[in-house]
Amino acid sequence: MTKFVRKYMFCLVLVFAACSLVVNSIRTPPLKNTVNGGEKKNADIEQAQTHHKKEISKNGGVEMEMYPTGSSLPDCSYACGACSPCKRVMISFECSVAESCSVIYRCTCRGRYYHVPSRA
């Protein structure tokens, strides 16, 4: 009986580990932003994608998708729910000249502020 339970638990752990690996390895390409100057951002993304394709054809190696690193402006496309137009606004705080002021982005629609969704 305990042998069966051990095998069952081992199979269960193995299935969960495999599912975890699959979920963590799936990545989606960056979204094209159309809010607040999205045309320029779309052109930058497309240029980076075509540059990457040229690199692959030159090197003739294994294709790997590249994702931008570092900070980027938040996307408010889905932050406001059904309310539209949802726009990104910058909120800054008064601070002394010696220190740097933090900048916070919020999504706003019809006078209401919504939390900016994080990219995970």
Curated annotation (Swiss-Prot):
Alphabetical UniProt keywords: Developmental protein, Disulfide bond, Secreted, Signal
Cleavable signal peptide: 1-25
GO function term, MF aspect, one: protein kinase binding
Tissue specificity comment: Expressed in leaves, especially by the MMCs and their early descendants cells (stomatal lineage cells) including guard mother cells (GMCs).
Subcellular location(s) per record: Secreted
GO process terms (BP): guard cell differentiation; negative regulation of stomatal complex development; plant epidermis morphogenesis; stomatal complex development
Recorded superkingdom: Eukaryota
Cystine pairs: 76-107, 80-86, 83-109, 95-101
GO cellular component: extracellular region
Cross-referenced InterPro entries: EPFL (IPR039455)
Induction: Induced by high CO(2).
Disruption phenotype: Increased small pavement cell (non-stomatal) and stomatal cell density. Inversion in CO(2) control of stomatal development resulting in an increased number of stomata at elevated CO(2) concentration.
Subunit structure: Interacts with ERECTA, ERL1 and TMM.
The family this protein is said to belong to: Belongs to the plant cysteine rich small secretory peptide family. Epidermal patterning factor subfamily.
Protein name: Protein EPIDERMAL PATTERNING FACTOR 2
Source organism of the structure: Arabidopsis thaliana (Mouse-ear cress)
